[in-house]
């Protein structure tokens, strides 16, 4: 594939960037923050009347003056204070606007803001301005920069020494905007022996319509004493098909080159890519079939041109562990065109590679490439923002066994180091991290569990009366409700798991929320903040499974933590 086609394919195909976890402390803080909407069990757009009704219902149960037991009176004081704070915050338009925008932390620091803006409209305008500033910050964050260094070392087997061959350093700057499109700049410096030259690749991508984008690129290189300008369009042709066309112009006397690229999703696992190039007295075409199943890649590529004949390659890339991959590829050619006589065929090369993910942002790879004229070893170190590759070509004769030993020895050494040293240390570190996390949330979980038990004690008599009332009209009766990690079981060998099981019984709290044979839990609200609930697995995804009777018929439904729950529904009926 020529350089222009590689650039077009690079622009055309979406980049598969690895998603990294957000900052753990911020995420945990957000997960653990109290949700006023969940406490009152109201929607995000609830009216003042709905807020008052929800507050009155909870105040009837949790008001300290209604408790005859002194211990319960003391315990309910904190809950009633929290319920009152939720009602006061959401009933005040200013405080509610701040809470919706900044959360509980914003309320804690909102006194100066509320005093500054006496009118709600001005307050909302200020919040809108802050939101726009945040969007501008995101725009700045859309700028990214990465670097790559390649140090090429060569080895002469006869003289038994390495020597410096080529050094290339490049940086890539990406600027992505919704209004003005995307820009990419890739300056580079290459040094070979006593010569050095500068290169600059630039590209611009602009959306013309919803499905069509214009791209422009320029590739300048001092070594070639000129540049190549490319202009083209890429478009979504159908639900499963993308296409692009381009034209490249050269500063030299070469004629313009036209090209096209077509990508079609044949099935959920198979993709076909066709590339074509046409120039005066030259044409080239290639077809790639790519199949990916459970992160296992199988790829076949066939190239054909009027000068180079017919060639092809097969690539296989498979994971051997959660963090390691191994790949194989082999290529060959066939005759029938001017470069090869009719019927001539042969071997063009083979490669084997090993890639290992060390951390979330760092990985290494080792690969060996073999062709009829040389062996090439490549050592790669890849960071999120920087990459270093060291190709080592060997130009003189060398036995295959020696070559394989040269390639496998570092991999075997790294594997032994991993299993004997690194893995035990990482396991010990991970266990320590888990224990620290458990200890950190143990007190918090105990308080939440004790509060939920007190909630259930307070509403138990009310729930029994509700159940009797619902039975008289064949209404809604919660048979069983379980909340937490439904696919996880109690580990009786772990004291923490025994004390804080992965799931909790919330049958009574849910029955308490039933009104007139209906139950509504609003979406986008954490269910762990509902009264009578507590979070058995902080910062982990949870579900709520409810089994209930309605009209003497059994129903069952499972929803995610922030999904809406509306019962009864016919779709929940167990046939």
From Swiss-Prot:
J domain: residues covered: 35-103
PROSITE patterns: DNAJ_2 (PS50076)
Record has Repeat as a keyword: no
Ranges in a coiled coil: 427-456
Keyword Coiled coil listed: yes
SUPFAM superfamilies (UniProt xref): Chaperone J-domain
Keywords assigned: Chaperone, Coiled coil
GO BP field: cristae formation
Recorded superkingdom: Eukaryota
Any one GO cellular component localisation term in the record: mitochondrion
CDD domains: DnaJ
Name of one Pfam family that matches: DnaJ
Family: Belongs to the DNAJC11 family.
Protein name: DnaJ homolog subfamily C member 11 homolog
Species this chain originates from: Dictyostelium discoideum (Social amoeba)
Gene name per UniProt: dnajc11
């Amino acid at each position: 594939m020529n350089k222009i086609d590689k650039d077009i394919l690079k622009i055309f195909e979406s980049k598969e960037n690895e998603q990294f976890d957000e900052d753990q402390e911020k995420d945990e803080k957000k997960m653990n923050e109290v949700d006023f909407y969940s406490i009152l069990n109201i929607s995000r757009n609830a009216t003042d009347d709905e807020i008052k009704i929800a507050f009155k219902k909870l105040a009837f149960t949790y008001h300290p003056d209604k408790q005859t037991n002194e211990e319960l009176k003391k315990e309910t004081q904190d809950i009633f204070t929290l319920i009152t704070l939720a009602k006061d915050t959401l009933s005040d338009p200013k405080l509610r606007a701040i809470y919706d925008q900044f959360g509980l932390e914003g309320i804690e620091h909102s006194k100066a803001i509320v005093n500054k803006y006496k009118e709600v409209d001005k307050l909302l305008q200020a919040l809108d301005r802050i939101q726009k500033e945040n969007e501008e910050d995101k725009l700045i964050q859309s700028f990214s920069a990465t670097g790559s260094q390649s140090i090429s070392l060569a080895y002469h087997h006869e003289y038994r020494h390495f020597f410096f061959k080529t050094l290339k350093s490049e940086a890539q700057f990406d600027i992505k905007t919704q209004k003005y499109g995307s820009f990419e700049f890739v300056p580079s410096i290459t040094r070979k022996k006593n010569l050095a030259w500068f290169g600059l690749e630039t590209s611009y991508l602009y959306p013309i319509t919803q499905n069509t984008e214009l791209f422009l690129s320029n590739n300048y290189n001092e070594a070639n004493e000129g540049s190549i300008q490319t202009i083209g369009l890429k478009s979504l042709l159908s639900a499963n098909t993308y296409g692009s066309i381009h034209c490249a112009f050269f500063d030299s006397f070469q004629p313009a080159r036209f090209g096209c690229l077509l990508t079609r999703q044949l099935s959920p696992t198979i993709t076909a890519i066709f590339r074509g190039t046409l120039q005066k007295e030259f044409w080239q075409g290639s077809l790639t079939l790519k199949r990916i199943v459970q992160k296992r890649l199988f790829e076949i590529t066939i190239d054909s041109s009027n000068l180079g004949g017919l060639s092809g390659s097969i690539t296989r890339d498979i994971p051997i562990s959660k963090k390691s991959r191994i790949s194989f590829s082999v290529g060959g050619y066939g005759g029938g065109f001017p470069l090869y006589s009719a019927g001539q065929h042969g071997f063009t090369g083979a490669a084997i590679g090993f890639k290992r993910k060390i951390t979330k942002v760092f990985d290494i790879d080792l690969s060996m490439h073999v062709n009829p004229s040389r062996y090439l070893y490549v050592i790669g170190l890849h960071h999120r923002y920087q990459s270093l590759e060291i190709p080592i070509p060997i130009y003189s004769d060398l036995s295959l066994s020696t070559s394989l030993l040269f390639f496998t020895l570092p991999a075997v050494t790294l594997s032994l180091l991993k299993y004997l040293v690194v893995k035990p240390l990482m396991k010990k570190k991970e266990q320590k991290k888990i224990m620290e996390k458990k200890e950190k949330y143990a007190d918090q979980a105990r308080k939440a569990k004790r509060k939920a038990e007190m909630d259930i004690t307070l509403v138990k008599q009310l729930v029994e009366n509700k159940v009797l009332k619902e039975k008289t009209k064949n209404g809604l009766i919660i048979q069983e409700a379980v909340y937490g990690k439904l696919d996880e079981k109690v580990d009786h060998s772990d004291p923490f798991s025994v004390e804080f099981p992965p799931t909790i019984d919330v049958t009574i709290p849910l029955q308490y929320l039933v009104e007139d044979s209906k139950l509504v839990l609003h979406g986008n609200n954490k269910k762990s903040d509902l009264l009578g609930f507590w979070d058995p697995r902080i910062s982990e995804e949870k579900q709520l499974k409810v089994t209930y009777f309605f009209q003497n018929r059994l129903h069952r439904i499972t929803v995610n933590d922030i999904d809406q729950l509306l019962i009864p529904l016919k779709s929940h009926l167990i046939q």
